[in-house]
Amino acid sequence: MTESWIHPSAVLLLGAVILPLLPRAVRRVFIVLVPVLAFGAVLLMQGHNGVYGVVPFMNWELTFGRVDALSLVFAYIMTLMCLIGSIYGLHVEEAAQHSAAWIYVAGSLGVIFCGDYLTLFLFWEMMAFSSVFLVWFRRRKQSLASGYRYLLVHTAGGLLLLAGLVLRYKATGDLNFGPIGVADPQLYTYLIMAGFILNAAVPPLHAWLPDAYGEATVTGAVFMCAFTTKTAVYVLARSFAGMEILVPLGVCMALYGVVYAVLENDARRLLAYHIISQVGYMVAAVGIGTPLAINGACAHAFAHILYKGLLFMGCGSVLHMTGVSKFTELGGLYKKMPKTFVFTLVGGLSISAFPLFSGFVTKAMIVAAGFEAHNYWAGFLLTLASAGTFLHTGLKVPYFIWFGKNNCSQKTWERAGDPPLNMQVAMAVAAFLCIFIGCYTPYLYDMLPFPDVAAQYHPYSAAHISETLQILLFTALGFFLLLKKLTPEPTISLDLDWFYRMGGRLFYWFARKPVQSVDNAVGEAWNRQGIVPLMRTARFWSWFDWHGIDTVVDGTARGVRALGGVLRLVQSGSLQINIISMAAVVALVLTLLAFV
């Protein structure tokens, strides 16, 4: 297995590079083939746990392939969802959209299989910088702005993560990605956790999610709803299992997302808010940290990727066919889009934890783990959040899109109809899996990190079925009694991002007005009181240098130069030559006188 081990990210990255180079005639086959190969690479790893793809780098070892039960369950569903999403997007002609989606998935899978923090950070940033194009490819002004905010937030999260990793390496000298000492947390522990929970969309670090997912392309939103937050759940489960602070954070997410989903008028933004709620269950489960809770987090992530992807595909189909996604502009579409209605209904029943659907066998595992760990308050509040889930996603979405008052314009009504065949096939596959998992639990339970614990959990007990049906039926009764109050309105719900958006404007005003005014005043005062005296002083010293110091120096230099000329004459030998010549003449005269 070591020699034949293939990283699914390598398959997707290679496919992303090759796809734009292929002729259009073969692209559709290739778009399906690449995810199939990536899914096959994960299937080949089943039963072959171990460490693969270790690469020496400077003084470290980069581990690209840590294969165990925890990584495999996430890799399995992520590659499967990549295949479903690629089929859903077959009608998209722009190759760059498919390439961006595959690079995004490759980043997620790289994080799933990594064994060290350096590799994790590499793939973590790959996720952020590739997924933003799934927002920008919609090519609207709002999408460009939303993508820019998305990138800024994730860049900040990446910096927090990097700071934590650097501090951890300095303190421990270890880059291995594994459990962090939650019993004795250090500063780097909280920095790393902050980087992770930002991707999990934990309030108040959550506003990027509905902002970006609501503005993404139809196919891009299907990919985005499946990978970023679930990758964050994986890294939290790997490194922060049992971190108690995650329990209240997760419960807060579950309730917060439900409230804002009820208020939302846009279908895809509603689903985005509900991602926050459902991921809250997983975060709380990681905080509980028991084997049953970790199983619940993994199982719910598995199911959530499928049914949330199905819901985004259904609402995306409505947007694709009609150009509209607001409830106040839709209604009565079950006649025009009957197949899409059925698929979306399956997703709504799954997310509402209706018996025989996937959410029923996964969500309750987390609630049961909470009660088992004596976190009764968490168990009760998560049960309350389940009622809210059925209220907005199980009832509000189907009612105001498919039934209810027909608010469609004539153009919207004429354009409405079931989407292209590839989109229907993708929704059908996801819908089938939602039902299959709910009816045959061993398919999912046997993949979980603690299969023995999962085998002892029985979701179809009389008490659980009775409790669930009571919650669902009373929620439905409340929905229809309060239907007028729950009717969507064409308004915008203010979220916590208002504070940093307004804070940004306040900072901009503060920089332009008070700070700039003070800077101008100080500058003018300096010009009057500082620059003028300084220039006068400079001119004086320039004059003194020119007429004083330079005169002395130049005069001295001229004297030295003259003396040097004299000394040079002596040193050169001219005087000696004259003396010798005179001596020679005298000697010659004396000789002549002697012989004459």
Regions found by a protein language model. Name each.
Residues 1-99, 173-182, 505:
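Transmembrane helix-loop-helix hairpins at membrane boundaries of multipass inner-membrane proteins
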Residues 6, 13-17, 440-486:
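A generic transmembrane alpha-helix motif of multi-pass inner-membrane proteins
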Residues 24-35, 145-155, 336-343, 417-431, ...:
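Alpha-helical transmembrane segments and their helix-start/interface "positive-inside/aromatic belt" motifs
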Residues 50-65, 172-182, 237-239, 363-370, ...:
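Membrane-interface helix termini and inter-helical loops of multi-pass transporters
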Residues 58-74, 181-189, 369-381, 457-464:
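Short aromatic-rich membrane-water interface segments that cap or initiate transmembrane helices
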Residues 84-95, 99, 105-120, 130-415, ...:
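Hydrophobic transmembrane alpha-helices and their helix-loop junctions in integral membrane proteins
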Residues 350-365, 431-452, 528-529:
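Alpha-helical transmembrane segments and their membrane-interface junctions
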Residues 444-466, 486-596:
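Aromatic-capped, Gly/Pro-kinked transmembrane alpha-helices
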